[in-house]
Amino acid sequence: MERLSERLAVARKALATLVEAIRERKTPLNRDASIQRFQYTYETVWKTAQNYLSVVEQLTLGSPSAVIRGCFQAQLLDEEQSRSALRMAQDRNLTVHTYNEALAEEIYARLPGHAQLMEEWLKAMDARMTSATS
């Protein structure tokens, strides 16, 4: 559980850097930096969820999509959040394979929603851990 608590703390810090970037004035440099922060925040959050599912729910899942589905089954995410999380996973994959200006703009526009979803996801894990240890 201690390792999971550490992962949650790291994920919250990563998310804070994304939120900070999103709040800045939009420039091409800030857009690209925000997308980069989204990439590492997403990676940190889904891997934290993977660890949570393993430790707390005894589910061993390997891919981001499987972890998202597992979080839905464990009721950490509702149906709408799960669909949004799968879309977020697609956005993350699109950001790393090629650079496309129009795509960067589209993904940048979705970052506030992605950040909100990751915040809710982390809060759900925090709440479950708190209730499990009390």
Please identify what each model-predicted range represents.
Residues 1-134:
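Solvent-exposed interaction patches of small proteins and small membrane subunits
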